[in-house]
Amino acid sequence: MKKMITFYLKQISPILVIGLAIVLGLNLVGVTMNMLEGPDLLFRAIRGTTVMSLLLILITTWKITKLDSSKENITLVSLSRYAEVTKFFGKLFAAYIAAVTVIITQSAFIWYYGFTTDRIATGDVWSFIAGLGMMFLFIFMFVCYFVIPVSWLKDHVKASYVQKAGVIILLFGILIFNLLAEYYLHIYNSAGVISILPDGNFEISLLSIVWNMTLCAIIAGSYIYHKSKKSDTI
C-alpha cells in the first residue's frame, strides 16, 4: 500500500509542487506587505490564496483518483495484484496526503494573520481540526459525486458529447436527490451542528455528514464491486 500511495503521489508531484510554490510565494508577498502597509493587504492575499489552495486540492484529487479508473488512464498499478478496494483507498489516501500538505501550508498564514489581528485565539484550534475533517469528507464527496461517474461514463460511452451530457445529467441528478432529501428529511438544517470556522459562520449538521457519508459509501462500494467483477472476468 505504501509503495502504491508513493507512486500515485509522484504522478501529481509536478502540479503539487508548482501550486504550492505559487501559494507560498503569494502569501510571503502578503506577509511582507503586512509589515510595510498593514494587515489589509495580507487579508486580501490570504483570501486569494485560500481559493487557490482549494482549487489545487480539487485538481490534485482529480488527477490522482482518475488514475486506473478507466481505459484512458491505466498505470503500472493496474498490472499489479492489488485488489480494486486497495487501489481505491490507496488513491484516496494519496489525495488526502496532498490535501493535508496544501492545507497546512495555507493554514500557517491564516493563523499568522489571525494571531496578529486578534481574530483567532488559541482555543480556536478545534475549528481547524473540524475543518480538516470536513475537507476529508469533501474530497470523498468529490470523488464519489464526480470522479467515479466520469470514469464510469468513459468506460461505457464512446462519444465525447454523450459523456459530457451524461456528466451534467448525473451531477444534476445528485443535486436534485440531495435537495429532495433536504425537503423531506431536513438533513442540512437538523440539530447537532459542527462549526468549522472560528467565528461560527460556517456550520454543518451531523445528519448531513451521515447522509453524504452513506451515499458516498454506496457509490464507492458499487464502483469497487463493478471494477472487481470486471477484473475477475478479464
Regions found by a protein language model. Name each.
Residues 1-73, 84-234:
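Hydrophobic alpha-helical transmembrane segments of membrane proteins
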Residues 78-84:
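Short helix-to-coil transition segments within interhelical loops
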